[in-house]
């Protein structure tokens, strides 16, 4: 979840999906 928060702070939606 934390990783998703960081990614969502400076990444695109599709990149966030890859993070999860």
Curated annotation (Swiss-Prot):
Keywords: Hydrolase, Protease, Serine protease. The keyword Cytoplasm does not apply. One of its GO terms (biological process) is proteolysis. Transmembrane segments: none annotated. Residues 1-20 form the Peptidase S1 domain. Its EC number is 3.4.21.-. GO terms for molecular function: serine-type peptidase activity. Belongs to the peptidase S1 family. Elastase subfamily. Digests most rapidly at the C-terminal side of alanine residues, but also cleaves at valine and leucine residues. This is Elastase. It comes from Gadus morhua (Atlantic cod).
């Amino acid at each position: 979840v934390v990783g998703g928060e960081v990614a969502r702070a400076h990444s695109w939606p599709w990149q966030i999906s890859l993070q999860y």
